[in-house]
């Protein structure tokens, strides 16, 4: 027994389609977090733990003078604690082969990287390969929601102007 009621309405389908369009339209640079909390390779894992707690993060890029050297995750911190080596350096535990995104990349490309690589964050590099941001799935969600909100506000403004234009036309005719 199938229901005659569709799974989603036409309006809902249009909204889903718009989200997909935005994933192709928006760039990583438009949705990323610009203020990057980063670590230095010579910091100890204890210092990294303090930074993670202070900024309430679960991972951070490792950089020197804006050049990405690696990435450290909460899993790396846990491993150092388990090993009893919390006083070793970030360089000893970081992942050196880092998957990154470019500021100019489309959001859809970053989404594909997240799905394919099972990672929690992407360091974002500029055209000179300097660290300029960090991208999480939450950043993408917030960016898409903000873009949808902007679309909605633009549509409302158009409707408002159109209704007033119609009123102006009607009032001009009544004075003729």
Question: How would you name each of these model-derived features?
Answer:
Residues 1-176:
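Tandem CBS (Cystathionine beta-synthase) repeat/Bateman regulatory domains
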């Amino acid at each position: 027994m199938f229901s005659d009621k569709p799974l989603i309405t036409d309006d809902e389908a249009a909204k889903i389609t718009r989200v997909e369009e935005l994933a192709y339209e928006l760039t990583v640079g438009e949705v990323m977090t610009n203020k990057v909390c980063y670590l230095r390779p010579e910091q100890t894992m204890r210092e990294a733990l303090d930074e993670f707690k202070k900024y309430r993060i679960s991972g951070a890029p490792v950089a020197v003078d804006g050049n990405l050297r690696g990435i450290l995750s909460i899993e790396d911190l846990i491993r150092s604690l388990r090993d009893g080596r919390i006083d070793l350096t970030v360089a000893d535990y970081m992942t050196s082969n880092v998957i990154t995104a470019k500021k100019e990349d489309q959001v859809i490309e970053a989404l594909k990287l997240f799905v394919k690589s099972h990672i929690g964050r992407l360091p974002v590099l500029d055209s000179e390969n300097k660290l300029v941001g960090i991208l999480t799935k939450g950043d993408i969600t917030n960016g898409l929601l903000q873009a949808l909100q902007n679309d909605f506000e633009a549509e409302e403004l158009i409707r408002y102007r159109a209704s007033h234009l119609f009123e102006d036309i009607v009032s001009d005719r009544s004075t003729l």
